[in-house]
Amino acid sequence: MKVLYVTDPGADYLSDQIYDGLCSVLERQNVIDFPAKPLYHDQQPAPHLTQNPDDDSALHDVESMIRERRIDLMIVSSPRSGAMEAFRRLNESANGTPVVLLDGEDDGRIRSDAARCVGAGLYFKREYKKPTKVNRNGGWSPPATFHEDSRLEGRIYPLPFSVTAASMSHPSSMLTRDVDISFVGRASHRKRVRAVNLLRRTKGIRFEGGVYLDAADRRSKLAASWLGIATSKLMGDPPAPAWAQMSRMNVQDYRALLHRSKMALSVRGGGFDTVRYWEIVAAKTLLVSEPPDIVIPHNFEHGRHVIFCRHDFHDLPAIVRRLRDDDQVRQEMVEAAYRHLLAYHTSERRATYLLDLCRRML
């Protein structure tokens, strides 16, 4: 099978991971990214992606391949404007080639207009909200609010993040697990601020990490309550003070912290699904997370692979105290979760799942 992968120039964890997985499953020469995305090649290497030799296919070359039916599947990797515009440039040559759309955006909205624009036969959604049930075609039936276009019914499938082979590399030296629990992330949701504040003020727990802000982030990002947000807004929502800004960790230090942690916390950001959710398990660290509100096929199980805490985190200190000294229980869960990750949640497995659905449904 040969796939044309229509790209957007911006970083997009879902589409970038799926490209990585497709190259592993189909081999690089059978996955053509158009326009060629520097992040996938040597111009702007990304630490979480396996780099591939540059193959800057010109527009006329790609159009010829489509017209000559040498392309078996077109994947529009994002509903963002760059990918949509690239598809429009190719649309006249599409010639009946099956098309699918990936949507890795933070919200739960189904972008029916984008699906219609590209003529998507299947729609893959990262933030695929519960409740759901399996329909008679074997597909996931989303809430009624999703059905803005009846042509998509039974053709929308969950596609959460995963972990790439490049991001599973372990630190070269053995590190001591001297941190009870850690969390590092942008202050993109007030729940992150609440969780960090709770862990910092809990006595007897060794916590490391925090939330960071970009230079343009405002003071309201640090508010842990609606009252705090409203107060910041009434003040004109000034920039966050310098003392409150944690520097963003580089990749090496972040991975080292995961490997020093007995447990690591995943908290929703713009969407529930975070890359951290999968990276923690890849580091063989016990994942503690709020229960997901999205569909994750073959998700980890509470008490067997991971620990799901309350949405308000009130039980989090007790969880940390109970498990930090129980090395055997933690190790059993960590090893079970790691095996489950390799079986179901690598970028290669995600790509295989996507391709199998395309072969069956298109």
Model-flagged regions — what are they?
Residues 319:
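Short amphipathic alpha-helices within nucleic acid-binding modules
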Residues 325-358:
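A charged, aromatic-enriched C-terminal amphipathic alpha-helix characteristic of glycosyltransferases
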